[in-house]
Curated annotation (Swiss-Prot):
This is Alkanesulfonate monooxygenase. The keyword Oxidoreductase applies. Homotetramer. Its EC number is 1.14.14.5. It holds the Pfam family Bac_luciferase.
């Protein structure tokens, strides 16, 4: 099975280390453009653009990067409760047309009650999922060209329609991740691809089985994806040393403050991430080569696959064997790590790469000339 490999745009900040300003990097449009163009040239299928008050607006970022990329798809957040589903459908169709069919959408219900209240959304966890189901039903039908009347508990529309359809038919694909039963019910009914954060394979297998069963009960099939960080190096020892360096500036106070802040979230997925490490920096390898160090201070995806290329590829294949065909990776800093993943991991996987245009480079594809005159030898694979 060919795998779809996506990268990540760090619109909330980037750097060499977690939890410190040391080694931090200014994330401006030029830097995001560098990462997007690198991902495009290296053969990543798309990029996930995060959402939330700590991030630049994902829609504007995606639109700004369309002219400087050729094949890269943009996985952009849909926020039920923050925007009307009919307006969101028009925006989605426009982005899909502007990008010539490179738009994908990620339904994000939100998990931070404080942030949601700041955006004017005052619904509890269950109510947010009720509203998200209504939002998605309307959004899908409008994008598919239907005239929609809908009288729901949270959303009511009358005569909603779309005049300018998207490039992708019947509409751009919808992605979604959530670990609660309400989230799985939504996924089974509404989405094309269900995402999970990087839990141990046994836990992921259980979630996949649950969603697959719920979807089958509705006569549907759902694809599956996973969101993970990656720390890949030429040797396993180098990879684990890089993982240690990533959290080398973290002190106990910073970890405690981060965990206290994340504890207010009502996201079941966030609670499952936190349970993997318990706020303790000891014993962070929670499954072979699955490291929970990122989650000590980062919300959302908090685990990384760590190892050399063949080792990480073997772990990726374990997840693929569960039915996962889409992997959304990231690494710190995101520009350099995109190259490491492409150079050290891709050769060991069957990666579904966008077709690249045939161009003639200004320099040879063999690396730097030896003594200005000799073509370097290729390294034998043994």
């Amino acid at each position: 099975m060919s795998l779809n490999i996506f990268w990540f745009l760090p619109t909330h900040g980037d750097g060499k280390y977690l939890g410190t300003s040391d080694g931090a990097r200014a994330v401006d449009h030029g830097y995001l453009q560098q990462i997007a163009q690198a991902a495009d040239r290296l053969g990543f299928g798309g990029v996930l653009i995060p959402t939330g008050r700590s991030c630049e607006d994902s829609w504007l970022v995606a639109a700004s990067l369309i002219p400087v990329t050729q094949h890269l798809k943009f996985l952009v957040a849909l926020r039920p409760g923050i925007i009307s589903p009919t307006v969101a459908a028009r925006q989605a169709a426009t982005l899909d047309r502007l990008s010539n069919g490179r738009a994908l959408f990620n339904l994000v219900t939100g998990g931070d009650p404080d942030e949601l209240a700041g955006d004017g959304l005052h619904l509890n966890h269950q109510e947010r999922y009720e509203a998200s189901v209504e939002f998605t039903r309307i959004w899908r039908k409008v994008l598919e060209g239907e005239n929609v009347d809908y009288d729901g508990k949270h959303i009511q529309v009358k005569g909603a329609k779309l005049l300018y359809p998207p490039i992708q038919q019947p509409r751009p694909p919808l992605y979604f991740g959530g670990s609660s039963e309400a989230a799985q019910d939504l996924a089974a009914e509404q989405v094309e691809l269900y995402l999970t954060w990087g839990e141990p394979p046994a836990a992921v297998a259980e979630k996949i089985a649950q969603v697959r069963e719920k979807a089958a009960a509705q006569g549907r099939e759902v694809r599956f994806g996973i969101r993970l960080h990656v720390i890949v190096r030429e040797t396993n020892e180098e990879a684990w040393a890089a993982a240690d360096r990533l959290i080398s500036h973290l002190d106990d106070e910073t970890i405690a403050r981060a965990q206290a802040s994340l504890a207010r979230f009502d996201s079941v997925g966030q609670q499952r991430m936190a349970a993997l490490h318990g706020g303790n920096r000891d014993n962070l390898e929670v499954s072979p080569n699955l490291w929970a160090g990122v989650g000590l201070v980062r919300g959302g995806a908090g685990t990384a696959l760590v190892g050399d290329g063949p080792t990480v590829a073997a772990r990726v294949k374990e997840y693929a064997d569960l039915g996962i065909d889409t992997f959304i990776f990231s690494g710190y800093p995101h520009l350099e790590e995109s190259y490491r993943v492409a150079e050290l991991l891709f050769p060991h996987l069957d990666v579904q790469r966008p077709e690249q245009p045939k161009t003639r480079g200004y320099v040879s594809p063999f690396g730097e000339m030896v003594a200005n005159d000799i073509l370097p030898k290729s390294v034998s694979q043994s």
